[in-house]
A protein has these predicted regions:
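Acidic, proline/glycine-rich low-complexity IDRs
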Residues: 1-67, 73-78, 83-216
Length: 216
């Protein structure tokens, strides 16, 4: 049974992508932190208009993050959900329905889930441009939060649950140790530099190229 907030999110994703998810995965309660509500990934297949996989969370926004100042008198939103956009050639199938389904794509979903759990675990507020170093070995060491600029409508990143309250939806991009190290070396300039690796802008901040898809 979905809560009203979760139903609004589900409907928001359906409206944005123009279709129902082909399947969903729920993070098992026995691996969740104590008192954290379950998180579900909705999987939307590539389409002609959006030729890439969309993995979208529902449940992270059940946690009300603490207030956070982000400068110039502004505060970060306090409820987030997350999406990961994946290259269409990655073979994504439901392992519950197909015993031959590959499972390597689940490593990307694990990064998505770890990001979705982070604010609750750390009792912190995370927002666009934040990086999370998960300290893991392998191709990726963590993630960065982006605005999913591949979508032309700004409404994609806000799911209104009432007239003045909304849930922010950030894109989760896996990052390598090399990228994270370069970002840290650049200090204050590293935040903008890292985001520009995925969405590149000109001097007027007009988007001129993008590489927004995760891959294995």
């Amino acid at each position: 049974m979905k809560s009203k907030r979760q139903q609004k999110l589900y409907d928001h994703y359906k409206t944005v992508f123009g279709e129902e998810p082909i399947f969903s995965l729920k993070l098992k309660k026995n691996v969740l932190p104590t008192d954290m509500k379950p998180i579900t990934t909705l999987v939307f297949k590539p389409t002609d208009e959006m030729p890439f996989w969309k993995l979208c969370t529902i449940g992270a926004s059940d946690y009300l993050m603490p207030e956070r100042d982000i400068g110039f008198g502004r505060k970060a939103n306090r409820r987030n959900e997350y999406m990961m956009l994946i290259f269409p050639d990655v073979d994504i199938r439901n392992p519950s329905d197909d015993e031959d389904a590959p499972t390597d794509w689940l490593s990307l979903n694990s990064l998505l889930w770890a990001t979705a759990e982070y604010a609750f675990n750390e009792k912190d507020n995370i927002t666009v441009s934040d990086t999370i170093d998960m300290g893991i070995d392998g191709k990726y060491c963590g993630t960065v939060l982006l605005l999913p600029e591949i979508f032309k409508t700004p409404s994609t990143v806000k799911c209104y649950v009432s007239e003045h309250k909304y849930i922010s939806i950030f894109q989760v991009m896996p990052i390598t140790r090399e990228l994270l190290t370069k970002k840290l070396r650049k200090k204050a300039n590293g935040i903008y530099w890292l985001m520009e690796q995925f969405y590149t802008h000109d001097d007027d901040y007009k988007l001129i190229s993008s590489k927004p898809f995760a891959t294995l």
